[in-house]
Amino acid sequence: MSNGIVPTIKLSMELTKVLADIEMNGLHINTDILTSIKVKFEKELVDLQKYLNDKVKYFMGDTPINLDSPEDRSVLFYSMKVTDKKMWATRFNIGYELRGNTKKPKRRTNFESIQDFYIEINSLARPIFKTHGTICHNCQGTGKYIYMKKDGTPSNVKRKCKTCDEKGLLFTNKDERAGLKLKPRNVIDCSAMGFKTDKEILESYLSTASDEVHEFLVKYIRYSAIRTYLRTFVDGMQKAISKDGMVHPQFMQCVTSTGRLSSRNPNFQNMPRGNTFPVRECITSRFKGGKILEGDYSQLEFRVAGFLADDKQVLKDVKNEVDVHSYTARILGVSRQKAKSDTFKPLYGGILGTPKQMQYYRAFKNKYSGITRWHRELQNEALMSNKIKLPSGRQYFFPNVERLRSGSVTNSTAIKNYPVQGFATADLLPIALINLKNLLTKRNLKTIICNTVHDSIVLDVYPDEEQQAITTLKEAMMSLSNECEERYGFKYTMPVGIELKLGNDWLNMKEVYKSNG
């Protein structure tokens, strides 16, 4: 195995040329489809907003709630309001701190029992009740009043009404508790404004929520997602489209800590899957009669972890075609796509979650004991040398790593995550991209590479070159084992699984080839 970083530098230099070609090639956007997607989901957004506003009034009475405000959402969802934010942050140790030269989240306060946690919450936050609002007579419901000068004439300046705190209404409490009454489960649920209201946290409450609360949570999660999709992907894409209907994202090798590629203007790395938001449908071929071909590596990071850890159980499961994401989904009772994040959590040393998730994480650690052992070795390596080294020669430095009383180390997640993500997407995928570009040129094909996303490669296929493009992409993606030996001095012995899909656009595609390796 290589001990130097030269092979990874050479790979990066070769990849730079390929990425330059991909940027120049760009992707073709069907603007009619993009516009129809925008119109459809803007309508859904309006309908969701009306539903949510009506329900907020039902849950809160006349108390105004701004769903864009983390503090207001915390009040709405948890029915409590923090009385002293500074003391709250201090008691639960919320915020960031410098560890070496890096800002990291503070380690949260550890309570002896859940009862102690609730006692602390109740001492620093007050319950919220539904309200009845009446017009503030001081400002006549405007929230501001006209300041009178000393000579008795009205000023042109309107001042904030302190009587109603600029709300225009005066509120009196009813006897009924307001909000959705979610119950925080541990200190991780706490935030600077009260309690967390992100998608992952809210989804974790769905299984125990009443029908009424469940419906509201689902609608809010959908509302938040659509807003993000419209702003980030539709609006971002529309701004980036050139006169010829193309977008040319910029690809960068030096932004992420792991070496994984990132892109901007617009960002194509976090493009939503079709079952959540169909923006991929507007990505079509630039060629009349052309197709879009995508090649995906199957469970690449899971297989890479098994290879780096020399975990025999991973190799056995891969050879027996065990779908680890489906296995996770069955245990947790969620979709395969949603299960992916839970599959990867123990892969990177994750231990926190719902009781069901934590049970799965423990089962994962026991089943894949080779990965568990390897995690300990990585931590020890980081402690001894302040760095970890991949067989490719790539190195990650952790100058301020320390042993914790729990037996773990600081930067534990990064120490376990970086080698897997880095080797998979910074050391292996570029090999396939470079080989693919060389093969397309050698075979004089007009088909071009137009995108790459983490562990996949996207081609714009010239008419009548479909079969040649499939064969060429398959050959490039399956070349990892021999190429690793040639470039890095070792053989990648884990079976390489790939799946190829072809379609008229990047969303509506049919499988044309699949191999487990």
Language-model segments: residues:
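Conserved "right-hand" nucleotidyltransferase catalytic core of DNA-directed polymerases
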Residues: M1-G274, G289, M358, R362-A363, ...
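Glycine- and acidic
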Residues: S2-G4, I22-E23, L27-T35, E215, ...
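Conserved catalytic core of nucleic-acid polymerases
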Residues: K17-A20, M24, T131-C161, D165-L170, ...
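Secondary-structure transition/capping motifs at alpha-helix termini
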Residues: N25-H28, K43, F59, T83-D84, ...
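Polymerase palm active-site segment centered on the conserved acidic dipeptide of motif C
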Residues: S36-E71, F364-R373, D464-G517
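Short conserved micro-motifs at the rims of enzyme active sites and ligand-binding pockets
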Residues: Y78, V304-F307, N508-K514
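Function-dense linear segments that define catalytic or interfacial modules
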Residues: P249-S335
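A structural signal for short, well-ordered beta-strand segments
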Residues: Y297, D455-I457, I498-L500
